[in-house]
Amino acid sequence: MPALAPPVGDERHALHTFLAYQQDAFVAVAHGLTDEQARATPTVSALSIGGLIKHVTGMQRIWMQRVAAAPDKPPTDTRDIEERTREYRDEYVMGPHQTLAGLLDAYAAQNAETLRLAQTADLDAAVPVPRDSPWFPKDVEA
């Protein structure tokens, strides 16, 4: 992985290259780790490398649903709150029966979908920001 992203010719190519560069960083961080090492939390943080990979996979999926629906909102998740809460909590933890290879396969599939949308999405369409999350500024319109 190079230290700097390569030069680009236009906005869409820049977006694609930037996203691919960021995606590659997580693969590099996990390179050579065993499942046990990917699951480990050796610092005060409860996050592991495997948990981070699951989280970035999920965040790409959620944001790409928004990008695909823009300028409209994505379809509402109609599952019950307990199921959505379990999924949210599970997103940060590499479970005992999960493998790093499996997580990286899911990540690679989502990366491909993200890069596909970067090539096809309307870059002028405003992507709605969730209003139900406290970490998003209330004064952001898109």
Language model: regions and residue ranges:
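Short, helix-capping/interhelical loops that line the mouth of catalytic, cofactor-
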Residues: 1-13, 58-117, 124-135
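Alpha-helical bundle segments that constitute or directly flank the non-heme di-iron/ferroxidase center
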Residues: 9-35, 54-55, 59-69
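Short, aromatic/basic-enriched loop-to-helix "N-cap" motif that marks the start
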Residues: 42-47, 140
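Individual transmembrane alpha-helices with interfacial aromatic-anchor signatures
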Residues: 135-142
